[in-house]
Regions:
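Sec-dependent N-terminal signal peptides
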Residues: 4-13
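Core segments of cupin and vicinal oxygen chelate
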Residues: 23, 30-75, 79-80, 137, ...
């Protein structure tokens, strides 16, 4: 009994220690699609994703729908069209190939993340990629765009502190 309790106790300590180690987590994927309406229908029906508000001003050429898939994970679907509502952005012609635009991650501290990026990324240390410039999302969160060693875009957003309730 004591041995079982001790093993259970050690498991919880190890779990909480590993949970505290990561300061970044997966946030969203942006996919370019050929038909936004059918893609939204697919993800909302098959995966029971919920639509969420798009926080930027609308554009007639760039049509976007944001979906919440599970807890804290988003799928952003986009479609580029011309004035005649025809898709203008070339997508991979191979069926089943993702139209991946960028990966999105959230971090606890943008400053700490940038320091780590500049310290550990050979491409940023060597000057292959310039240090990213911090921008802000419409709701105020710090954001940057970086690239991985293959040149894939990664969108990094600093987590906003949760508002404290004044009701007691």
């Amino acid at each position: 009994m004591i041995k079982s309790f001790l093993l259970l106790f050690l498991f919880f300590i190890a779990s909480s220690a590993s949970a505290q180690k990561s300061t970044a987590w997966y946030h969203h994927t942006l996919l370019d699609v050929q038909n936004l309406e059918s893609s939204v229908a697919f993800y909302t029906q098959v995966f029971q994703a919920d639509t969420i508000p798009y926080p930027f001003p609308p554009s007639p050429q760039y049509i976007v729908k944001w979906l919440k898939v599970g807890e804290g994970v988003e799928l952003h679907l986009s479609q580029w069209v011309n004035n005649n509502n025809k898709v203008i952005r070339d997508l991979p012609s191979e069926p089943g190939h993702l139209g991946l635009v960028h990966l999105g991650f959230m971090v606890m501290s943008m400053d700490s993340f940038l320091t780590r990026l500049m310290e550990v990324s050979t491409d940023y240390k060597s000057g292959k990629y310039k240090q990213p410039i911090i921008d802000r999302m419409p709701y105020g969160a710090k954001t940057i765009e970086i690239k991985d060693p293959d040149g894939n875009e990664i969108h990094v957003i600093e987590a906003m502190p949760k508002k404290r309730s004044t009701n007691r």
